[in-house]
Every structure is written in structure tokens, then in C-alpha cells.
């Protein structure tokens, strides 16, 4: 053992001596010839040679260490650029991590188009958070270039598996794409609104300059093109708002969209009609109260700034000026029901329609047409429900006789004004107060009535009797509270006692055929009113032209309803059931059989 250790020591000594003799060997071989020309002492020559040799060795060592460090950095960079292994199901769902691990209100999702500086900041954060310039989709996320994170990232993802079915992931992915598309659509709306606002500002400046009498002829052609462009842009915006209202709520409430909305991620910046649209780098809104729909955003623009008629309408323009002055009132706004552009648009058209009906009803022929049409429609509806129209016809005649007496008009006006009717006009009394209110009441029936009609253990006849009894009791109770026991409202309640149970059972009852009849009746009435408020269906140029168009629409809708109800001639007051074409044909066959 000692021999082996001694042998090892001798080998190490020999190697050390060999290494130590290398500089001496190099000096004796090369150093003497190099330093022979220098007049120095031998010891100084050895020192200079050792210094030069050490410097060369040190430089070679530093170069080698530098190359090794560069290779190590390249290796670490390649490892850091590799994406972390994200589960496939999480990629499909594309949900932020905050939605998976727990509710974090400060987490936000931005629009995928925020990578461009030209986009508006449509989505903002609730709390202070860092906004990235890239898309915030979970599929494009990368882990920072840290060695520690790159080593343990895969284990972290594997430690938190996502329990989600593949089909659910695909649905969530589709819903996320829908959400991104809606965000882009809202951004397009903002751009169009900005373009329209700029166009109106330029148009106002151009008109101001033209009013001073400078360059009127030269500006005429560009102004016409600008006006046409603004009209097309307004039409596009109007259709886009309707499209967003129709398809803005098609995602189920338990989906990704509902989750995002619950965290307040769809927040739009506030916008006022008197302030210009903010730039892209403007401060975003951080309040949940700033969320509003496209319809509300559309209403913030004034009518004079965003709506121009495509065809001349002097009567409408005059009515619109009265509306702006606050001289036109109504009982209830029907803007959405009649598909008007805004409340001002509805009021202006309402004022025109009132004037047209005043002109129409000056003619005795037109008055008789409207009276007979109403009687025939309600009688035909009762016949479709297998009810006798005798009592209704008698009450209807009493009502007409009461309204034709001029001494009753002040009392009727007082009663109707107490119900909110602001104008004694055919539209306000018959179409709005009677028909539209009846349709609205049938859309929200009492819960007790709905419970009876949905009870499967009750027969249809019992349901119809119970509903009729409820209507009669309510109407009789209202009649006892009237200030004028034999006035206009009292006569109206008498008619309602015969018509309301049939309409209620038709709209709410189990009979499909009667429900279809009542639904078509309502659709025709509502469409008749919509056509009356449509610039494409009637002319708002003058009162006679509008009255002529309304009369034409009235005849057309009356023909449609009479043809659908299958009744041509109705009895006046004899109470006999009107015969449908089938019943008339069978009656003729019976008569011919008796003659034979």
C-alpha cells in the first residue's frame, strides 16, 4: 500500500517538474534566439519571456471562457423560447386563468384588435392593470424568459388539470369567437359614428362659409357628394343598430359571454352628444355604470345631427320644428312599437297623422267606412270564436249614437283627459287608447289567470268560463267607480264585456286555431300602424296626400282581415250569426234538398 502511494507521489512530482521545465525549454529553444538581439542580463530576459508567455496564456484562457459563456446563453435562450405545455382543453375554451381558478374582479379581457394604434379603446379594465399590445387570447400567451419558470412550468400546468369535456370546450371556443366578432362589430360602429361626426362638422363649416357668399358654385358638386355619402352612412348605421339589437343576446346565460359580462369586461367608454369621440390613447372608463347598449348610444345623437330625410317632406319638417319647440304631446310613446327613428321622429309623425285623420273624418263616407270596418272586424272575430255578436252589435250601436251627439263631447273629453288622452283624435282614442292598450294588457296578464289557464286538470270550457267571469267582474268593478256612469268610458266598458273575454281566451287560451286568429288580427293592426308611420309607405309632404295614403292603407288592411275572417256581409242589429262561406254553401244545399 505504501509502495503504491509512493509511486503515485513520484508520478505527480515528475509531472510537476515536467510542467515547470516547459517555460525553461521554450526559453532555451526560442527565447534565446529572440532576446539575443537585446542587450539585457540573462535573468531579465527570463522574466520578460515568462511575462509574455503568461499574457498569451491568459488571453487564450479568457477567449475560451467567453466562447463557453456565449454557448450557454444560446442554450438558455432556446429553452426559454419554447412555449409551455398548455392543455388542449384549455386552449379550446380560451378562457382567462381567473375564470378557472376563482373570481378575480380585476382581471380583464381586451379586444383582439388592440394591437393596432388606430383602434378605439372599447374595453377597459376595472382595476389598475397592465395593458399589453398583443392579443389577450389564451392561445397566444407565452411564459417570460426565466430559467426557473421554464423548468417548472410544465409541472405547474400538469398539477392543475382542467376538468372540461371536449364538446363543452368547442362550444366555449365558438362563443368566444362570437364575442370577439361582436367586439369588432362595436368597434366598426364607433368608426362609422366618428366618420359621420366628422362629416357633419365639415358640412356645417362648409355651409357657414357658403352663407357668406364665397365660392358657392365651386362647392356645389362636392357638397352633393358629401350629402349622399352621409345619407348612405346613416342608413348603414341604422341597419347596424337593428342588427346588433337582434343578435346581441343570442349567447346562452351559462356560457362564456355570461361569465365575462358578470365580471364587467364588456365596458364601453362614455360618449356624449356634445363632445367629440375620444382618441385611441384616451383614458378608458373604469365604472360599471358606463355600460350601455348600442340603442342607447344611438339615442345620444340629436335628431338634427344624425337624421336627414331621403325625400322631401314639408309636412314632416314643419311638425318636427313643433316637436323641437315642445308643442307636440302624447299619451304614451310608441317609438319602438312603430319602429320610429327616435321619440322626436315619433312625435313629428304623430302630429302629421292627427292632421290627416281630422281631414279624413270630415267626410261622411270615410266616417261610415271606419265605423263599419270596426264593427265587421270585431263581429268576425266573435264568429271565429263561436260567439254570437248580437250583444256586441247592440252595444256598438249605442256607443256610436252616444258619440254622435255633440252635447256629450265635453264630458267625453273630460273623461278621456283623465285617462291621459291629450288629443281628441281618432288615432289617440281608438287606435292608441283602445286597441294598443288592450294588446299591452294581454301581453302581461295576472298570474292568477295564467295559473288557471295552465292547469291541465281543468277542462277548456271551465277555463273559458273562469276567464270570462274574471273579466266581467273587473269591468263591473271599474264601472262602479266611474264619475260619469253613462259616459264614454261606461259605453266602452259595455263593449269590452263582450270582446275582452274572447280576446283574452284567444291570446292566452289553449285553442290553437283561435290563438292564430287573434294573433293575425293583432299583427295586421300593428302593421297598419307601422305603415302609417313609415316614410316609404305614406307621403309626409302635405295633409291631403298623407290622408289619401292612410285611407288607402286602411282599405288594404280591412280587405285582408275581412278576407281572412271569411265574412263579406254582416247583419246590422238582428243578432243572427254571420255565415262563413262554408256555412252559406251548406245552407244552400239544405234549401235545395227541401225544395226537392
Swiss-Prot record:
It is found in: Mitochondrion outer membrane. Homodimer and heterodimer; forms heterodimers with miga1. GO terms for cellular component: mitochondrial outer membrane; plasma membrane. Regulator of mitochondrial fusion: acts by forming homo- and heterodimers at the mitochondrial outer membrane and facilitating the formation of pld6/MitoPLD dimers. May act by regulating phospholipid metabolism via pld6/MitoPLD. This is Mitoguardin 2. GO terms for molecular function: protein heterodimerization activity; protein homodimerization activity. Keywords: Membrane, Mitochondrion, Mitochondrion outer membrane, Transmembrane, Transmembrane helix. Residues 124-140 have a biased composition (Low complexity). The chain crosses the membrane at residues 11-31, 40-60. Belongs to the mitoguardin family. Residues 67-158, 576-596 are annotated as: Disordered. PANTHER family: MITOGUARDIN (PTHR21508), MITOGUARDIN 2 (PTHR21508:SF4).
